[in-house]
Structure formats: C-alpha cells, structure tokens
Regions:
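Rossmann-like adenosine-cofactor binding region
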Residues: 209-291
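An N-terminal-biased, well-structured beta-alpha scaffold segment characteristic
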Residues: 2-110
Length: 419
C-alpha cells in the first residue's frame, strides 16, 4: 500500500502523524510511504530524516491525496482539503465528527473510509489512540490554566500552589478519565486543592485509593458542579462520550456563581465542549472572556508540545496503521474489532452511532456496509462464516468468554467506566 503523511495546516499545529522511526517500520513491511515536504519540521524531523527512513518526499497535499491509498494526519481535514479526498481512500486521523456537521457531510460525500483515532476501542472500553493525547492535554490544561490566572492575562493573580502563609488555589476537574486524572495529578503536584468529579462510583473508589491526599474525588451532579464552581480558581472540563458530542455540564447561568478572573479550560472542546459558553480557539488567540470568566478552548492543545506528542502518537497509531496497510481496511476491520470501532464513515454511510446521533443522520452498522457475507466478531465485527457452524459457535463462545473476563477485571480495577 502507498501510505501518505500530510503536513498539518491547522493554526499552530506542529505535530505530524508519523515519525521517521514509524516510516521505517512501514517500509520494512513492504509499503511505500510518501511524506509531504516539511511535514515533520514542527516536531524536529527534517525531510532528510524521512528519506533516510525510506520515505518519498511529496511536494504538495494534492500529490499525497492523489497518489496514496491511505492518508494519515493528526487533526481533521479542513475545508480546503475536502475536494482532494477520494472515493475508497482511507483517511486515518482524529476526526471528532460530532463537533462539525460540515466535516461529517464532506466525508460522507467523498466516499472515503474515515478511521477516527478517537474511537478505536479495546474490549475493556479503553481508547488507545486517544489516551496519549489525553494525557498530554490533561497535563497542559493545568499549565495553561495556571498561566492565565496571572493578572497580566486578566486572571485574578493567584498562584495555584500558594506560598507559606498564603492559601493555595482550588482546581475543579469535571471528568475522571485520562484527561481529568492527568490534570488532577499536575494540579496536586503544584500543591492546589483539587476536586475531581466523576459519575461512576467504582471509578471514584479507585481514584480515592490512588490519587494524592490533596485530591478529593466527588460524585458529579449539577448540585456538586454548582457548589464547587463557587470555590474554584481553575476549572478543567474533561468530559468524554466516545464519538459523541460532549454534554453541556456547565451552563451560562452557572458562570454567575464563579469568582471573576477564574479560568475555564475546556479540553472537551474537540467534541463541542462541556461548557455552554465554550467555543473553539487557537494558539494564536487562545482566550476570551464571558461574564468575567476567562475561557481557554484551544482544540489542539498537544500541538504546542509537538515533539513529545508526535512520538507518543506514533507509538500508539503505528500498530493499527500497519494492520490497515498490510491487510486493507476491510480485512483489518473484520479481523480486529478495535479497528472496526474506529471506522466512523465508509462508502457514504455513517457507521458510528454517536456521529449519526449528533446530526440526526442514518446509522448503518459496519457489517452491512462490508456486505452480507462479512460479519463481525463477538463484540464488534464478526466470526468468519466460511467456518463450519460448530467451529463458528465455538469461536464466538470462546471470544465472548474472554471478552467478558477482561471486561470484568477492567471494571473491578476502575479502567472500565459504565454509563
């Protein structure tokens, strides 16, 4: 397969979808890799580095889209790219479709297969391609929030960690997943008092055991959100429903409860935001104010620490990219339900329920798009029906038992959060 890697064009997006080390592995598997010129510059990788790894340097986005069967990116395609996406082409990137009807309709119209990093899902419910960037964004949320608390940026002039004789700041983190936990850890490390809200009691029990003593896991409810907003100096929105629009948990009316100069960092902005007054911003113009509350809603936060982010992203995506390149996207989806979960749009059909629900579009199960003889495996994309019936039953039984054993262990450990 010819695999293309594009230079990102979103404002101040310095990441690239593949490192030279990743390219080397794709080439070792017999694939041709085309890298748009200067694609890795923002992450410290030159065209020469990619050529040494075996890549071909391509002069333009058009050349990449025209010549490559699979195109890899970091952020979603922008409108200028929509006409370049071809029928049958695989686009492998963060899409966050639920935040953009325009993007969703463009990919439907293209006839391409959209494999979204953020919905590739393991049997235990974890999101392996979202996790590394969630870790980065969670850590950055507190760094950025602490900065904009400074008076020179319009904040209240408060140091989160305080100093001897002066009280520490208070941080409210809404959501106890990967983003929330990483944000809470950084805030605790600075010495702040941290309230970490989540709706899953088993998860809260786990967090109570593992988080530092200045972190207080609390049940998430409208009443508790209102209560802790009044105390908070920094609020981090870290809510996620995979593939779907984020719920609006902080309403405009709630801003009136907050102290002037408080900072909100809405990491959920990729999925529409969990704060009613949130709208996407950029690294060029990252903040705005509503009712005296500073909002930081940069949709590509990890792009500012591109060297770390690019390596972490490649570590996560490369195994899946290799499977798609080696087998083709249909066979890869049939054999690996994790990849099947990542397919949001294929052949003009919406194959991910959260995306269809976000815009009132028709949802088509992936197995119907793949065809009547190509069924999914036990929990996502089907056993091979070419096997004898008894063998199929045994395969499904064994896979189902293994899946539920894994899910039960994950639930007990807190890694699996039930709605």
């Amino acid at each position: 397969m010819i695999v293309g890697v594009l230079k990102e064009i979103k404002s101040k997006e310095n990441r690239v979808a593949m490192t030279p080390a990743g390219v080397e592995q794709l080439v070792a598997h017999g694939h041709t890799v085309g890298i748009e010129t200067l694609a890795g510059e923002g992450s410290g990788f030159t065209d020469a580095h990619y050529e040494q790894a075996g890549a071909r340097i391509m002069a333009s986005p058009k050349q990449v889209y025209t010549q490559c069967a699979m195109v890899m990116k970091v952020k979603e395609p922008l409108p200028v790219e929509f006409p370049l996406i071809r029928k049958g082409q695989v686009v492998f990137t963060y899409f966050h479709f639920a935040a953009s009807a325009e993007l969703t309709r463009a990919l439907i119209a293209s006839g391409a297969t959209a494999v979204a990093y953020e919905t590739v899902e393991k049997p235990n419910g974890s999101l392996p391609l979202l996790t590394p960037m969630s870790e980065v964004a969670g850590k950055m949320a507190v760094h950025e929030g602490a900065k904009y608390l400074e008076k020179i940026y319009g904040g209240k002039g408060k140091l989160l960690g305080g100093v001897p004789g002066v009280d520490v700041g208070t941080v409210l983190v809404i959501g106890g997943g990967t983003v929330g936990v990483n944000a809470a850890k950084i805030a605790c490390g600075l010495g702040a008092k941290v309230y970490l809200l989540d709706s899953n009691l088993e998860r809260l029990r786990y967090l109570s055991d593992v988080m530092p003593p200045n972190c207080f896991p609390v049940v998430s409810s409208p009443a508790n959100i209102r209560k802790y907003l009044q105390e908070a100096d920094l609020v981090v929105g870290a809510v996620l429903i995979p593939g779907a629009a984020a719920p609006r948990l902080v309403t405009r009316d709630m801003l009136k409860l907050m102290k002037k100069g408080t900072v909100i960092v809405d990491v959920a902005i990729d999925q529409g935001g969990c704060v009613e007054t949130a709208r996407p911003t950029t690294h060029d113009d990252p903040i705005y104010e509503v009712d005296g509350i500073i909002h930081y809603c940069v949709a590509n936060m990890p792009g500012a620490v591109s060297m770390t982010s690019t390596i972490a992203l490649t570590n996560a995506t490369l195994p899946y990219a290799l499977q798609i390149a080696d087998k083709g996207v249909e066979r890869a989806a049939l054999e690996n339900p994790e990849i099947a979960k990542g397919i949001n749009i294929m052949a003009g059909k919406v194959t991910y329920p959260g995306v269809a629900q976000a815009f009132g579009l028709k949802y088509t199960p992936l197995e119907k798009v793949l065809g009547p003889k190509r069924r999914v495996s036990a929990y996502a994309v089907g056993a091979d029906r070419s096997l004898a019936p008894a063998a199929v039953d045994a395969a499904l039984r064994d896979e189902a038992i293994a899946y539920y054993q894994t899910a039960f262990r994950a639930f007990k450990s807190g890694a699996l959060q039930l709605p």
